[in-house]
Structures are given as structure tokens and as C-alpha cells.
């Protein structure tokens, strides 16, 4: 349950930051979740290369919170609420937010596991190693199970599970 709570809070931070940035730069908020997540993955990648992957996760969380703080100071709470209302009126942004919440709730209820050789199992091996070790999986040259997985998939999973035990469904 804590995994779900953390994921939903992170999603709130992410979407709120997108709404505030969209207000600041007069962009559609639907354009921002992918670049913001990509930027988070770049930060995690650079910190992972340096051996500080968990520090990178904290840096991403602090950066998202900083956008909220700047937004609350610059636009006041009423302005941030207006930015949220404008963001919620954009169908693609609402679809992103609603779809993410739906997937998280679905996985929380069903809690799928890596039990067979399917796409879900193949995709999940590398993120599992990254989350459990707090480092890239290539640090162990003996274990080649996840050598085919791109680092970004592992890092985006790590962003949503940087602390605590690994949960396959999360």
C-alpha cells in the first residue's frame, strides 16, 4: 500500500509541476509529462553512473517540489489552483493523469508477478535488479539476465520505487 501511496504522491508532484510549468511558459500541459520524466531519467542516469542512484531520486523529488514551491510563491495558491483547472481541461493531460492512476490502482489490486516467460517478466528483470541494488544492473557482469533491457525503463521504475523493498506490481 505504501508503494501505491508513494506513486500517487509522485504522480501528483509530476502533474502539478507540469501544470505550473505550462502556466509559466504558456504551453499545453499535455506536452510536459514526457519531457519532465525524460529529464528525471537523465538525472537518474548521471547519478547512477556516478554511483549515487538514490541521491538522484531525491534530487528529482526535490526538483519537482521546488517547481511547486516556486509556483505557490509566484502564482499564490489560487493561481496554482487555476493552473490545475486549466490543465484538467486539456483532454490529453487528463487522459495521462487518469490513465496513470488507473494503471497504478489496477496493478495494486491484481498485483501481477513474474511467473512465466512473457513480456511482463522479461521487462521486469532489469528494473528489479536496479531497485534491489540501488545501482545499474551491469555492475554485476556475472548476471546477464537483463542485458537486453534499456536503462530508461529501469530508471523510470526506480523513480517510482527508490526506497523500500521491490514490489513486482509497482
Where are these regions (language model features)?
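Membrane-embedded, hydrophobic transmembrane alpha-helices
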Residues: 1-87
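Generic serine detector
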Residues: 28, 38, 89-92, 147, ...
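Internal/C-terminal transmembrane anchor helices
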Residues: 88-109
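Active-site lumenal/periplasmic loops and adjacent helix-entry segments of GT-C-fold
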Residues: 102-170
